[in-house]
Regions:
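Flexible, low-complexity linker and terminal segments
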Residues: 26-174
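Thiamine diphosphate
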Residues: 1-44
Length: 174
């Protein structure tokens, strides 16, 4: 479909997952820029293409924010890894092995090292956790405001809020 706002729903995450492309999901205009820059750095580190999931509610509004440093200060996890660059002469099964066993874990390691997934607020005695990304994260925060729940009252209730920036593959250590 065309890259434009639309009245009909479209979804590409399944195609991106099938192509083994890590997906970042920003919730605000500022995060589109932040995750876009982080996505470039993640791509350099992991050798993978990186996608941004963008929904109409995030794109069809204006906002003001300070631009991050385009050079960025990213942590590149240490450790030995094979050559993860795309090489057209690699046999298909080797390409798949590199993607599944090296590129995707490298993208997860980059997300972990750079705090793309984060605990928004925590509770000393956790009873319930909410995981929300992108637009759904903003909806959850608005629902909390509507219910009169601030971070202190959520902590008292044992509620933890987790916001993944990398929605696929999920970073397992969070």
């Amino acid at each position: 479909h065309g890259g434009k706002s639309s009245a009909s729903a479209h979804q590409s995450e399944h195609a991106l997952i099938a192509a083994m492309i890590p997906v970042l999901y920003p919730s605000t205009s500022a995060e589109i820029i932040e995750y876009g820059l982080a996505g470039w750095a993640m791509s350099r580190y992991s050798g993978a293409y990186i996608a941004l999931k963008c929904v109409t509610d995030t794109l069809d509004f204006s906002s003001s924010f300070a631009l991050p440093d385009p050079e960025g200060v990213y942590v590149f996890p240490s450790g030995r890894r094979p050559d993860l660059s795309l090489q057209p002469n690699r046999p298909p099964l080797v390409q798949e092995d590199v993607a599944v066993n090296h590129r995707l874990p490298a993208a997860q390691a980059f997300a972990r090292a750079n705090g793309l997934d984060r605990v928004v607020f925590d509770a000393p005695l956790r009873r319930l956790g909410i995981v929300a990304a992108g637009k759904a994260y903003l909806d959850v925060r608005q629902a909390m405001v509507d219910l009169g729940l601030d971070e202190a009252s959520c902590a008292a209730l044992g509620l933890r809020l987790y916001k993944p920036g990398l929605i696929w593959p999920l970073e397992p250590e969070g």
